[in-house]
From Swiss-Prot:
It comes from Caenorhabditis elegans. The gene is chk-2. Serine/threonine-protein kinase which is required for checkpoint-mediated cell cycle arrest, activation of DNA repair and apoptosis in response to the presence of DNA double-strand breaks. May also negatively regulate cell cycle progression during unperturbed cell cycles. Phosphorylates and inhibits cdc25 phosphatase, preventing entry into mitosis. Required for nuclear reorganization and homologous chromosome pairing during meiotic prophase. GO terms for cellular component: cytoplasm; nucleus. Its EC number is 2.7.11.1. SUPFAM superfamilies: Protein kinase-like (PK-like), SMAD/FHA domain. This is Serine/threonine-protein kinase chk-2. Keywords: ATP-binding, Cell cycle, Cell division, DNA damage, DNA repair, Kinase, Magnesium, Metal-binding, Mitosis, Nucleotide-binding, Nucleus, Phosphoprotein, Serine/threonine-protein kinase, Transferase. It is an enzyme of class 2 (transferase). The lineage of its organism: Eukaryota, Metazoa, Ecdysozoa, Nematoda, Chromadorea. The keyword S-adenosyl-L-methionine does not apply. Residues 66-127 form the FHA domain.
Length: 476
């Protein structure tokens, strides 16, 4: 039995197949311990280590003990990482014996045992030298630091995801987020190992607006909206696959987390991001909304949680996401939906009167208010008025932190939060102001242009729908 494990989870019986291991000129390996393809041909693989970093091969696992590390005469390994010896950023973290993968002969469970002082991580959690962790299908294996992901562990008999998805993508168990419909998982495209986000939606859950069953056609609406969009500040969609009660949307991976986390980061002392950084982000969001409205799309749920950061840097590219409530603005919009503290007065009134894309401008004003100040413009914490009353009257309270924000910026926020829609600016009007022509906005524009590059994962994808009948495909 394997001792010192950090977790135990139920797992079906699975098998170590190894690819031929070449000798590293500077790190000799004991060839007696290196199993070639012919030696393990009789053993059926119980699992695979899928290489997701450039230069690292995938490894079939069929034996009960498999060792990974740099290797040496006194520390033989089955896989010695010689393929990435020139990848200094990774190779410097690899120990002679980094980790081993062991199959318990009694329980048939699979464990990763960490042998390295630099550390081995599973799902971005450090195991610790001398400790073990049970491996489950889709687990991520990293070396040294969370960002250095090298393998995805795939069980041979795993059936968690449909073949229509797994034949094109490696789906990990690493969660990027959860919502009312399902979850978002980290994935990799098999053709080029490019990283993607896979949004798994349970079509038996209710929709956020109508509380009705979320039919495939409801999700198709979101997909159809996203298909029309191509902008560096908007998350791209690559693929859509629907099988039985689940739909899978394969979208652009954005690794910096939610913008909300940045806004409330303790390093800003709940005082907001300030004038310079706030305007840097304001330009990006206004540009994204300007584009959406120019192609006839109203988002209807703009909030910090639906804005993603490209990375953890202080100045990063923002990406607008979650188009579940988006609608073609040519069609009539009357539904009360969205998030209460970011909803425009005309939505809150809910009098059955049509509203316009200017509801997005109001929501943007709310986002920028909290961006500059660190607190929301409308809140249930104000006990003198209900949330709806605050919104319907446009009551704003400017606390002390606004003293470091220019009057010009304060006036722009007030303009966006004008109760009467006809007096509220459009995205075109906002972008045309002198406020958007400052040095920080010019820097933002330059950074956006630098970020534009071909996305390999966006190579021709197909919409796939598998229900009662055969798979139907349509070019995106």
């Amino acid at each position: 039995m394997v001792r010192g494990t950090k977790r135990r989870r139920s797992s079906a019986e699975k098998p170590i197949v190894v690819v031929p291991v070449t000798r590293d000129d500077t790190m000799p390996v004991d060839e007696d311990l290196v199993v070639g393809e012919s030696q393990c041909a009789a053993s059926k693989p119980f699992a695979k280590l899928v290489g997701v970093r450039r230069g690292i091969s995938s490894i079939d696992l069929a034996d009960d003990h498999f060792v990974c590390g740099r290797g040496s005469d006194d520390a033989p390994t089955n896989f010695n990482f010689s393929q990435v010896a020139k990848d200094v950023g990774l190779y410097r973290f690899i120990s002679k014996i980094q980790f081993s993968i062991d199959r318990d002969t009694e329980t048939r469970r699979i464990y990763l045992h960490d042998h390295s002082r630099n550390g081995t991580l599973v799902n971005q959690e450090m195991i610790g030298k001398g400790l073990s962790r049970e491996l489950m299908n889709g687990d991520l294996i990293s070396i040294g630091i969370p960002a250095l992901i090298i393998f995805v562990y795939e069980s041979a008999d795993a059936d968690h995801h449909p073949e229509e998805l797994t034949k094109k993508y490696h789906v990990t168990s690493h969660s990027l987020g959860k919502g009312g419909f399902g979850k978002v998982l980290l994935g990799y495209k098999k053709s080029d190992r490019s990283v993607v986000a896979i949004k798994q939606l349970n079509t038996q859950f209710s929709t956020r607006c109508s509380r009705a069953i979320a039919k495939t056609r409801d999700i198709r609406n979101e997909v159809e909206v996203m298909k029309k969009l191509s902008h560096p500040n908007i998350v791209a969609i690559y693929d859509w696959i629907t099988v039985a009660k689940y739909s899978y949307m394969v979208i652009e991976y954005v690794g910096g987390g939610e913008f909300f986390s940045k806004v409330v980061d303790s390093k800003y002392n709940r005082m907001g991001l300030g004038e310079s950084l706030g305007k840097y982000f304001a330009f990006q969001l206004i540009d994204a909304i300007l584009y959406l409205h120019s192609v006839g799309i109203c988002h209807r749920d703009i909030k910090p949680e639906n804005i993603l950061c490209s990375d953890k840097a202080e100045r990063c590219i923002l990406k607008l996401t979650d188009f579940g409530m988006a609608k073609n603005s040519v069609n009539r919009m009357k539904t009360r939906c969205g998030t209460p503290s970011y909803n425009a007065p005309e939505i809150v009134a809910n009098e059955g009167v049509e509203y316009t894309p200017k509801v997005d401008i109001w929501s943007l004003g709310c986002v920028l208010f909290i961006t500059f100040s660190g607190y929301p413009p409308f809140s249930e914490e104000y006990t003198d008025m209900t949330m709806d009353e605050q919104v319907l009257t446009g009551r704003l309270i400017f606390h002390a932190q606004w003293r470091r924000i220019t009057v010009e910026t304060q006036n722009m926020i007030k303009w966006m939060l004008t109760v009467e829609p006809s007096n509220r600016p459009s995205a075109v009007e906002l972008m045309s102001t002198q406020w958007m022509k400052c040095a920080d906005c010019r820097t933002a524009k330059q950074d956006i242009l630098k970020s534009i590059k071909p996305i390999s994962a966006a190579a021709p994808a197909a919409l796939q729908t598998t229900q009662a009948g055969p798979v139907k495909k349509a070019k995106m």
